[in-house]
Amino acid sequence: GIRVPVERLAALCHQYGAKICVDAAQSAGVVPINIGESGIDYLCCAGHKGLYGPMGIGILVLRDPLDRLGTIIEGGTGTQSRSLMQPDDPPERYEAGTINVPGIIALRSGVAFVAKKGQENIYREELGMASYLHRGLSRLRRVKLYTNEPRAPWYVPVVSFNVEGMKSEEVGEYLGRKNIAVRCGLHCAPCAHMKLGTEEGGTVRASVSVFTKRRELDALISAVSRL
């Protein structure tokens, strides 16, 4: 849940002629991101988290729209059907085959929802909920937390924890039986877990949203307290 100093990292990369790609999966839709001011060259994010879209859709934003990236998948695009080569121009260059139209439409609705509610309002509400959850879990003797209480502007509304004597997957299965959805494991960030010393089993990650109710967090805290 800790926000890294992207601006400083981007400046360091550019100093040595390197470009920087930022995975904004946990921050897109929650905290403001200005690609021009931050120095981000490539920004990618999932659509099903803070942007409230469905799974199976994501976004890639290029700081320089003329930047020609290599492709992983190539195929028909419907725009240059006579050519046997992948188009050079975006976005067709990166959208081979039949695109996920339902996902794009749903993601657009999610982005519109975020824009209407306002990122500042979303961040304030979600971070308040995450802080409440962190305080509740911190009172439980067997719970280990890996960050300080989430505070602006250094955190996103995510709380990672473990329960002493239990694997993260065991905690997740237990909570799942109580209709509480969390994510367990390495969260696609093995290097971060190496830093935390949790690379063997990962952690339990609880993420809040604008739809999270305090009573739901109380249910999570209460369930963990029984372990």
Predicted regions mapped to residue ranges:
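Pyridoxal 5′-phosphate
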Residues: G1-L227
